[in-house]
Regions:
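Short amphipathic alpha-helix used as the core "switch/output" element in two-component signaling
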Residues: 66, 88-99
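Charged docking surfaces used in two-component/phosphorelay signaling
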Residues: 42-50
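Acidic catalytic/metal-coordinating carboxylates
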Residues: 60-63, 86-89, 107
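Non-catalytic signal-transmission and effector/linker regions of two-component phosphorelay proteins
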Residues: 1-30, 136-155
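Alpha4 helix (beta4-alpha4-beta5 surface) of REC/receiver domains from two-component response regulators
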Residues: 89, 102, 110-130, 136-144
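The feature encodes the CheY-like receiver
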Residues: 41, 83
Length: 155
């Protein structure tokens, strides 16, 4: 008998029929989604892709950096707790290379607040989503993050 892992992603039947989408017909913002649980990274990337974003999953910090160098992201969405390089370390590294990249962190871990406080003391401010990540919350935060960074795309 094998145990099924519990993934902190909302069941598809709980996803509203109408989700916020990227309304720009010309511009598909590149979003890099990172989680060591491939089902979560893949699901979030798929939600974003279906909503009009060019989303790519990665499963650890090193892979995310390699992917970012090939396709510079406008937004990084990463789990805080990754093996090896933490999501916060990844976010700082990505911003060193791509200073205009926006960052959304997500976590279901209580220890995250200590890591965020440490990053803030070092001058890094990040937005945090908590697991489970609901599609409507994800898309709202993505839209808000990209609106701030791209005022020229507003109608």
């Amino acid at each position: 008998m094998t145990a099924k892992p519990h993934l902190p992603v909302v069941p598809i039947e709980d996803v509203p029929a109408s989700l916020p989408t990227n309304t720009s017909k010309k511009h598909r913002p590149i979003v890099l989604v990172v989680d060591d649980e491939s089902a979560i990274a893949d699901t979030l990337a798929e939600i974003l892709t279906l909503s009009g974003y060019a989303a790519m999953p990665a499963y650890d910090g090193e892979e995310a950096l390699e992917t970012a160098l090939l396709m510079p992201p406008e937004l990084l969405i990463t789990d805080v707790m990754l093996p090896g390089m933490s999501g916060i370390e990844l976010a700082i590294s990505i911003r060193r290379i791509f200073p205009d990249c926006k960052v959304l962190l997500f976590s279901g871990q209580a220890a995250t607040s200590d890591l965020l406080a440490s990053a803030k003391r070092a001058g890094h401010q990040f937005t945090l989503l908590t697991k489970p990540v609901y599609p409507t919350d994800l898309l709202k935060r993505v839209s808000e993050s990209l609106e701030v960074s791209q005022p020229a795309h507003r109608s």
